[in-house]
């Protein structure tokens, strides 16, 4: 169980999250929609230090070594090819199978990773994340920039991860979470506006619209 307790994050004068509390069971796919979703994932990974609140995994502070993170705008070291990145991933994750992932999310092996177009950089970042055996996986805007086929394949991979016993958090537009999450939260104005089970998607859309929460 990941517990987010009264999390508060400010960015200068702006409050991104204001006392957000969530209880996220293990071995499930959880969706996060609404304003502040990326800030929440960055706090879970330790890239943002909360102004207040706690994040725990099984009652203990969540550690970065337990978490894998695919950022919304992935960046790679200049000069490294896609093949170099995959070789490093296999070195740190023996037994992983990049070829199987590349069949679903293809990326040109001999291209420089940092020079790839946005969609291909996104696919590479997702492949590297999915090769990682971490207990918790964070996907920030994973569908942004993907073509229809790649987005479909990614949805199948996310469903597979949930069935394999991983805990996956997907920060995305509300419409993109339909059909892949066990439950999902909608944020707005820095707080949780609603929590919904997977079968309550239509209700979540109605309530988000009634609350004036725009899809971004």
What positions do the PLM features span?
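Conserved beta-strand-loop-alpha-helix hinge in the C-terminal portion
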Residues: 191-213
């Amino acid at each position: 169980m990941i517990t987010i307790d009264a999390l508060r994050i400010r960015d200068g004068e702006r409050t991104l999250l204001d006392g957000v509390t969530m209880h996220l069971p293990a071995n499930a796919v959880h969706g996060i929609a609404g304003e502040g979703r990326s800030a929440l994932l960055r706090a879970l990974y330790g890239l943002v230090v909360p102004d207040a609140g706690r994040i725990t995994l099984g009652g203990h502070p969540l550690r970065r070594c337990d978490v894998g993170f695919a950022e919304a705008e992935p960046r790679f070291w200049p000069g490294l090819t896609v093949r170099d990145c995959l070789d490093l991933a296999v070195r740190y994750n023996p037994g992983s199978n990049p070829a199987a992932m590349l069949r679903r999310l293809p990326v040109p092996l001999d291209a420089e990773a940092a020079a790839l177009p946005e969609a291909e950089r996104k696919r590479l970042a997702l492949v590297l994340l999915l090769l990682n055996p971490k207990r918790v996986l964070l996907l920030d805007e994973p569908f942004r920039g993907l073509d229809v086929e790649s987005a479909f394949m990614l949805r199948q991979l996310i469903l597979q991860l949930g069935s394999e016993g991983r805990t996956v958090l997907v920060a995305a537009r509300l419409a993109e979470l339909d059909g892949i999450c066990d439950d999902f939260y909608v944020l707005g104005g820095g707080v949780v506006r609603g929590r919904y089970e997977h079968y309550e998607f239509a209700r979540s859309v109605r309530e988000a619209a009634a609350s004036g929460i725009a899809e971004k």
